């Protein structure tokens, strides 16, 4: 799956939650990505974040991907 497709998908998820408060939208998007995206998809979107700063992601999707990257990094360090 291409990075551009993953960006589009993350933005779609964030769009679903856009009617919620900002915090709830970020939480919902993060939870969806963490629960339903394959680890390879998560690694790819995290690599996109590291490489480009999250180019193309909406603010809600960007915040959720940043949180995802932080949680995955913390989990790797504690393992």
Where does each model-flagged region fall?
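Intrinsically disordered, low-complexity, basic-enriched segments
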Residues: 1-31, 35-79
């Amino acid at each position: 799956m291409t990075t551009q497709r993953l960006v589009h998908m993350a933005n779609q998820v964030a769009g679903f939650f856009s009617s919620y408060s900002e915090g709830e939208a970020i939480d919902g998007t993060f939870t969806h990505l963490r629960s339903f995206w394959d680890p390879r998809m998560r690694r790819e979107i995290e690599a996109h974040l590291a490489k480009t700063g999250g180019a193309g992601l909406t603010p809600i999707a960007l915040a959720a991907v940043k949180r995802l990257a932080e949680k995955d990094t913390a989990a790797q360090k504690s393992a």
